[in-house]
Regions:
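Sequence/structural signature of long amphipathic alpha-helices
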Residues: 1-163
Length: 163
């Protein structure tokens, strides 16, 4: 008996739950952004006059040489980060992000189970390769680099054989 189709159905259901959790986080965050901006501080304009911002103390330290100005910006940033964290907690964003992270880990764990389960049919190999590409490919920039390009081409070949 081939377990891959059942595992793949579970994987798809978990992936759908994860996508819904991401959308929920985005919705809460959009509401929060309607009330306040991301916690950041303005930096002096760049060489071309463009506006720059810092969202972390390291960036401030790298850009601002005056210790007094640097400390002031870092304190302002800390206050803004604290307000953001409090608002995120109050609106449920922090809890939603925790749920999303747990679902993401569960998706990857189930992908590992699926990928290590022996395939008994060509269709199961196609499903396994699809899961491998969807969970392990480094990103869209890798679509044209080896071995990801070749793995995608092999997946197309296998799908053709499976039909």
């Amino acid at each position: 008996m081939d377990l891959i189709p059942r595992l793949f159905a579970e994987f798809q259901a978990l992936l759908d739950r994860h996508e819904a959790a991401l959308a929920y986080c985005d919705c809460i965050e959009a509401t929060l952004l309607g009330q306040m901006d991301y916690p950041r501080v303005p930096l002096p304009p760049d060489w071309d006059g463009s506006h720059r911002y810092a969202g972390d103390a390291g960036t401030i330290a790298h850009v601002i040489s005056s210790s007094r100005h640097r400390r002031r910006l870092q304190r302002v940033l800390q206050r803004r980060q604290r307000r953001w964290a409090e608002a995120a907690q109050r609106t449920g964003l922090t809890a939603a992000q925790g749920q999303e992270a747990a679902l993401d880990a569960a998706v990857l764990d189930l992908a590992d189970v699926l990928l290590t389960t022996p395939a008994r049919t060509l269709d199961a190999v196609v499903l396994k390769l699809g899961v491998l590409l969807s969970t392990r490919e480094p990103g869209s920039h890798a679509e044209t680099t080896s071995p990801w390009r070749e793995l995608r081409l092999i997946l197309v070949d296998l799908r053709g054989l499976a039909d």
